[in-house]
């Protein structure tokens, strides 16, 4: 970041991690500590490094306990300290909920970054009974979006831009070339409403970029997990025509951006 500012004095630069605010499963102090631990590892490790130029203290203590501290070369610490972002970009899909670990958690090779499964002696993943889930098991938490924005702005006091937010689903193309994805419209509407509320809370937002404009290959599920406003006629086993079809959400979001987010109606 320092090099960017040196080479391009008028440029703005910032990190763009994937952030999932972590809730404790209960008000038990042990669960609260577990949530703090996972928040530090899952979220603040990246942003503390980018914004403040130092490792998060909880993560560093964990690394020391496990003899896993990185080695710093000459000038590394200074380079980190001198990198000052102008903004924070972040991806948001859901929150996570955890409880205290009993030390028996095993690494789950099928887990992904959006499903908190557990880490021995650190936290144990907990299914939040208050939240619905997508067809792929990710919890849906629009209000958690607002909570995430509030927490990030309180910690870092930098303007933010949402670099990814969207719903992966099994979309169906009708015989007349339509995709009726009202579920995606509802998902996006509720999340955009929460951004607007976060702005009234005092958070500074630069922009919102939904994921995504067009169906593409998901790293875990391939083409079957669709995010786009535009349907691509093809799947993992058959390229088909690769023709493009505008989904209902395409026309809805066109209206949203033409009104600068003021019109979220159907």
Name every feature range the model reports, one short phrase each.
Residues 1-266:
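Active-site region of glycoside hydrolase catalytic domains
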């Amino acid at each position: 970041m320092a090099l960017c500012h040196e080479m391009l004095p008028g440029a703005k630069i910032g990190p763009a991690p994937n952030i999932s605010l972590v809730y404790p499963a209960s008000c038990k102090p042990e669960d609260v500590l577990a949530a703090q631990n996972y928040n530090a590892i899952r979220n603040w490790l990246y942003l503390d490094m980018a914004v403040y130029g130092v490792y998060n203290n909880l993560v560093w203590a964990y690394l020391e306990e496990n003899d896993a501290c990185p080695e710093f070369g000459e000038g590394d610490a200074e380079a980190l300290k001198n990198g000052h972002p102008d903004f924070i970009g972040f991806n948001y899909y859901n929150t996570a909920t955890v409880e205290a670990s009993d030390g028996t958690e095993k690494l789950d090779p099928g887990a992904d970054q959006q499903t908190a499964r557990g880490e021995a002696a650190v936290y144990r993943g907990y299914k939040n009974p208050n939240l619905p889930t997508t067809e792929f098991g990710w919890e849906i938490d629009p209000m958690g979006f607002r909570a995430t924005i509030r927490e990030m702005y309180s910690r870092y006091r930098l303007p933010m831009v949402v670099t990814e937010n969207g719903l992966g689903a099994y979309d169906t193309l009708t015989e007349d070339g339509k995709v009726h994805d009202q579920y995606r419209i509802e998902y996006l509407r509720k999340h955009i409403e929460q951004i607007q509320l976060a702005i009234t809370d005092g958070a500074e937002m630069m922009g919102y970029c939904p994921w995504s404009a067009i169906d593409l290959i998901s790293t875990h599920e391939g083409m079957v997990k669709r995010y786009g406003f535009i349907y691509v006629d093809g799947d993992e086993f058959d390229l088909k025509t690769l023709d493009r079809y505008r989904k209902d959400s395409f026309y809805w979001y066109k209206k949203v951006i033409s009104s600068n987010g003021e019109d979220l109606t159907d």
